[in-house]
Amino acid sequence: MKIRYAAIFLALPLLCTTAQANSFLHYAGEFNFRTGEKQNNVTIAGLSAIIFDAKKNIFYAINDSRNNNKEGDASLYTLKIQVSSRGIEQVNFLNQRPLLDAKQQPFVTNTVDAEGLALTHNGKSLLWSSELGAPLRLSTLDGVMEKDFTSLFPARFNISSDKESSNGIRSGNAWEGLTVTPDGKSLFIAVESSLKQDGPIASPINSGTARLLQFSIDADGRPSKQLHEYLYITDPVPQVSKFGINDNGVSEVLALNDHQLLVIERSGRNVSAGFNDWDYSVRVYMVDLTAASDIKNIDSLQDWSNKSTLQPVSKKLLIDFADYTSSADCIEGVTFGPLIDGHTSLIFVSDNNFQPHQQTKFYLFIDKENKLKI
């Protein structure tokens, strides 16, 4: 997500979250890179998603550059992360490759803004979401696009919509979260915030809505058809900026199975005049789809006459980063990592937004009771 918003104050019912974070997760610390820092000639910036390939013991990451002079190349990274019960021992970036289109050329400027990343079940390709251009693409492990899946998305998302259109995704609030289920049979992709026809985005006085889509995946790891669509309610903006610029939305999802996911809500607030100096509040929720309504046939939540019959997904607070660190940055990626002494690990990564005052940060949690075991 690029930070370029003005605050919107419209009314939706408040969603009050009273659940406490779970104690079975042990926070094992963070590992940071300064903006501008390089490693093995790799520029470390703009990381918006990360995924672990357990068979190869490597991680893939992606950045959200729009292929412009300021942000550099839209890129795919491979890296090694050494973890132990003591924390993150080392992060080694192995290489950085440009994301290329089907003709093996760099994407045209402002037709790419990669936000989500998932490894196909066969380990041969990568799926990634984008806020610009095609919402979902399949690429080789070297970053060359094999196919885009725009045709799978319903017309209500108005993929090519401009800022003046009255329906569809909002600029900068589009396709943030992406995950493939552990069995490789389906994927989830999440819109960051409310569609234009669904109501207002989150503000300090109202919740927001986000749509979570589920697609089936064929034997080759390619999405084939939409299965379901669910309503996720984001929290109101938790902290208000005196400059009146703030937001809250979904920044990533991670599937535990076909009906339970982790969802990151990332809220930013401006701490000085302008648009480039932000602090963040980040919460992670355990989400269950079991009792949720399927809204794939509802084009507009605002116009739907039977709102009282709609059941959003359930959510329970798992992690509030404010409980563990005073400097949570713009966290946009999460993956399961290597086992640590037989325990599941979670690794989060932040997007420095190519800004000098931010950092690229990796955060490690260890599931001491293996409650998140997949």
Summary of predicted features, one role per range:
Residues 1-7:
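Bacterial N-terminal signal peptides that target proteins for export
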Residues 7-15:
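Bacterial N-terminal signal peptides
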Residues 21-374:
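Sequence/structural signature of beta-propeller domains
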